Amino acid sequence: MGDRDAIDLALGALRFRDLSAAELDARLDARGIECAERHEVLETLARAGYVSDERLAHTRAAALAERGCGDALIRVDLEGRGVASELVGRALETLEAERVRAERVAARRGWSPATIRYLAARGFSEEALETFVARDADGAIG
């Protein structure tokens, strides 16, 4: 397959949403594109600004945080997409504090033990949930 065909496949995959370099590489591999050609296509698209793991990390982290996800869930999502841990860490640093995001979710859902479980399942850290556990111990939740 020619470089142009591989680039067209890659651009088609990027048509509706950002993909990490690893995700795009896997898609091209599944379509039978050889390793050297995939590498060349990924470099070309990165230079042109079509593929950026850093941009993906920041936009995806912000979107997940807006949807009420904690840092652990965001980290798992991004690393599962093949984004480097360093880029994930930088993206998480730009987000609003996890405790503030957890409090916003709790204000919307109500302060209850079920909300604490919900937040834990959504990847919020124990540190972010300490406020809620303290309220529960004081009898303020429930």
Q: Which residues does each predicted region cover?
A:
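An alpha-helical, amphipathic repeat domain used for nucleic-acid recognition
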Residues: 1-142
